Amino acid sequence: MCGIVGAIAERNITPILIEGLKRLEYRGYDSAGVAVFDNEGRLQRCRRVGKVASLEEGLAGTPLLGRLGIAHTRWATHGAPTEGNAHPHFSSDEVAVVHNGIIENHEPLRERLKGLGYVFTSQTDTEVIVHLLHHKLQSIGDLTLALKDAVKELHGAYGLAVISAAQPDRIVAARSGSPLVIGLGLGENFLASDQLALRQVTDRFIYLEEGDIAEIRRDSVRLWDVQGNDVQRETVQYHEGAEAADKGEYRHFMLKEIHEQPSVVQRTLEGRLGQNQVLVESFGPQAAELFAKVRNVQIVACGTSYHAGMVARYWLESLTGIPCQVEVASEFRYRKVAVQPDCLFVTISQSGETADTLAALRNAKELGFLSSVAICNVATSSLVRESDLTLLTQAGPEIGVASTKAFTTQLVALLLLTLGIGQVQKRLADGVEAELVDELRRLPTRLGEALAMNRTVEKVSELFAEKHHTLFLGRGAQFPVALEGALKLKEISYIHAEAYPAGELKHGPLALVDSDMPVVTVAPNNELVEKLKSNLQEVRARGGELVVFADEGAGIEAGEGTHVVGMPHIGDVLSPILYTIPLQLLSYHVAVLKGTDVDQPRNLAKSVTVE
């Protein structure tokens, strides 16, 4: 959600901090700030509500020059988005803190610190941290030791960075439930909540693990684990080009990422398909042994990843006969779970840092699940490190808040998982795996054909320019696709959108249908298409306007109030992946017509690292 950047160097670090914040804008935020230990030996800061550009304007009038500093983009959790609530927070102009996460016991700590004479100027939980650190420093005298002592009193999730005027030779940092990464330079070092913020200055990174404390100086880095032991963490070199953070020829990152889907799906498949079968060892050397034991599957995820899991349930049960449950992580983690025998626990997350999904995985380890598999896009993420097996999607960095290419690559990975389990247990019908492997090889081409309909979808989007409500319908494995389509539309166009199984139309949603409520549906040519046609007739009978993305063989014809976009033919199993594409394009073009911020929609964050 929020973003952290820190730097210590022999040069002016303010431009580095600002550029880092710009690279984190995709995560979503409502205010930004920077604090620098200036060349006169003072801690100075600048904070602004709104975009990083507003912060830049403030710095243009009053430049902050220094060799040590921290910066932050805030997404409000405690306290409104105001300048006073923006980070960094100060204590006595001597200590500055930036913080991602939520301190659950901030209220009793606040009252205690008030009793010690501290005056609070914000409504944030973060201000508790900076005053607590200042208090510890009075008796301890060393910033690193003070932080080690202070975190013992913090309950909740935090990734935080601290600088002090008393010790301007270091940044100290702590990670518990919110990611932090150190960037290594030559005679300079950096800190961020996401390596993307630092790629302009380094390609060498150290990822803090849960409970780690870090002391970052210009020419050294020291780490301590949760037990207080000196530790070394692996240095990871990043090789991917910086073009991922550049829109190139596209107007928005979202449109660029939609059009990248053929290539990222191709990359996700590379090295994972044999001549006629999925290569099970691509999940790891122990995968075959594990897959042989699976009798049940539990999938846990949030948002778009949850919709991917819902599609996987249809695949697992129809292709392998293995029962599968899918649950939202924020619900799973807080209920008493009855674990089925030999149950594989599967998590799905683009970032691998989604707070509820990580917490669910940690809970699962105590509940007796067979093993854990992560479907994730970030190799160095907490989810990957804490799971037994991983299948990495190869979507590359996804900048737009509304997920597109991450979703389709998750679906590909989940189908590979389904086929892998079915293969090992010999549960797949004769010829099915070879047929689906062949279709997977041709999938990037089919996705390209769907993207070629961009102009047609753009024309259809004009129907939504003055609409405020939309209904999405789907049957079978297309119902989660309808859910995803509704989510995309509401996320970026701010049109209220709901999705239902088409068979539920008469059980309530039909009451909403009129000429002002367009109904969007996807119609592959399968055994459910005739039933879907009946649902569409019910909509037209109530004056509802239909937008149908239909297989050429489905027999759905355009007419008054019925707008049909013909889709390339694809087998039923892979159709949820293909039919996602036009719904993404529709949402994008409607949002452009509405004039919304496509890449950074209001109130939303890319990576939800707090509850």
UniProtKB/Swiss-Prot annotation:
Reactions accelerated catalytically: D-fructose 6-phosphate + L-glutamine = D-glucosamine 6-phosphate + L-glutamate
EC number: 2.6.1.16
Enzyme class label: transferase
Active-site residues, Swiss-Prot/TrEMBL: C2 (nucleophile), K606 (for fru-6p isomerization activity)
Compartments reported by the entry: Cytoplasm
Keyword Secreted recorded: no
Gene3D superfamilies: Glucose-6-phosphate isomerase like protein, domain 1 (3.40.50.10490), Glutamine Phosphoribosylpyrophosphate, subunit 1, domain 1 (3.60.20.10)
Cellular component terms (Gene Ontology): cytosol
GO BP annotations listed: carbohydrate metabolic process; fructose 6-phosphate metabolic process; protein N-linked glycosylation; UDP-N-acetylglucosamine metabolic process
Role of this protein: Catalyzes the first step in hexosamine metabolism, converting fructose-6P into glucosamine-6P using glutamine as a nitrogen source.
NCBIfam families assigned: glmS, PRK00331.1
HAMAP family found in the cross-reference section: GlmS (MF_00164)
Protein name: Glutamine--fructose-6-phosphate aminotransferase [isomerizing]
